[in-house]
Amino acid sequence: MKTTTYSLLALAAASKLASAHTTVQAVWINGEDQGLGNSADGYIRSPPSNSPVTDVTSTDMTCNVNGDQAASKTLSVKAGDVVTFEWHHSDRSDSDDIIASSHKGPVQVYMAPTAKGSNGNNWVKIAEDGYHKSSDEWATDILIANKGKHNITVPDVPAGNYLFRPEIIALHEGNREGGAQFYMECVQFKVTSDGSSELPSGVSIPGVYTATDPGILFDIYNSFDSYPIPGPDVWDGSSSGSSSGSSSAAAAATTSAAVAATTPATQAAVEVSSSAAAVVESTSSAAAATTEAAAPVVSSAAPVQQATSAVTSQAQAPTTFATSSKSSKTACKNKTKSKSKVAASSTEAVVAPAPTSSVVPAVSASASASAGGVAKMYERCGGINHTGPTTCESGSVCKKWNPYYYQCVASQ
């Protein structure tokens, strides 16, 4: 990875601002869309806005703001089911930019029994993906290329109610303490099969991270060869896991079998649009605290296998994390500071969407504003250089996050 590449791209993007935040908005089970999950009658414990959590000691780290409030519905799954999480910046439209391409970082998934997890306890990591040196890609690049979707496989756990917690850590301001941005939601599931793989004791959230952990206080703008994914190891009893190359073949077989049972065909050697270059912000202390930058991502194509779902045109096939091979390690114990866990593989099992474009467009703040002079929920409504609407739609107010970025959020 070249520092000069990032520097040149940073200069090109310095004047571009984009609302870059994201939330989980829907879930798929074995390729079947479960509908919008972040609504009043949904199944996702959703926050009032798509803004990140930055204080790793906050109770909002558990399930985000309002995460202690149960959702109306609970989805039913069984061991071996493939669950797909679908992230979006604004809405589920095909034009949605998912998250700003400048927001590089890992994607992880935790699970916990509902009662314990709601209190921040017994969280077990079942999947993770980080940085791939061979392709110079982050998990977030792959997520964007796959239209916000990534998979896990439900472990063979005892029947009961569980929370699944997908998480993104955006490191575009990770070069300063407190700059990393955490995005997460808790999705409510009922496991109907009665497996024998008891979850380990897990970790506490908050508590699992500190602001100075190597993978949280991390400068993506300087040269590096590896990235230590924060948090515990992936539980060796999970069916999802990390993207380590040593186990990608096993994951591919597991995922293919699970998806083939519910989808009619397999499309081989598809090309996935994936980011090969990052667009970053100025790394001065002032700009790092206030500026969010995004620009078009140059993509590179790689042949992978895709399990094609027979649902809707929106059912792009998501990233699948490979099965972890770290069975000799104690599950879900915090790693030491010196430990470097590298997610780098050219043989990663990725379930990817059919190619639609070689470029993933980033939406500028002004371009994303709604027509008619009124900004929609979560859109930009003010700040330095803003030329779009400054009035928010009914039910939302314009909140100042920093001098550069004001956003429409739900009225309190």
Swiss-Prot record:
Use case: Lignocellulose is the most abundant polymeric composite on Earth and is a recalcitrant but promising renewable substrate for industrial biotechnology applications. Together with cellobiose dehydrogenases (CDHs) an enzymatic system capable of oxidative cellulose cleavage is formed, which increases the efficiency of cellulases and put LPMOs at focus of biofuel research.
Glycosylation sites: N151, N334, N385
Signal peptide from the UniProt entry: 1-20
Keywords: Carbohydrate metabolism, Cellulose degradation, Copper, Disulfide bond, Glycoprotein, Metal-binding, Monooxygenase, Oxidoreductase, Polysaccharide degradation, Secreted, Signal
UniProt binding sites for O2: H172
Manner of cofactor binding, per the entry note: Binds 1 copper ion per subunit.
Residues that hold Cu(2+) according to the record: H21, H103, Y183
Principal cellular location given in the protein's record: secreted
Keyword Ligase among UniProt keywords: no
E.C. code: 1.14.99.56
One biological process term in Gene Ontology: cellulose catabolic process
EC supergroup of this enzyme: oxidoreductase
Domain notes: Has a modular structure: an endo-beta-1,4-glucanase catalytic module at the N-terminus, a linker rich in serines and threonines, and a C-terminal carbohydrate-binding module (CBM). The CBM domain is essential for binding to and subsequent oxidative degradation of polysaccharide substrate.
Full protein name: AA9 family lytic polysaccharide monooxygenase A
Native source species: Aspergillus niger (strain ATCC MYA-4892 / CBS 513.88 / FGSC A1513)
Gene: eglD
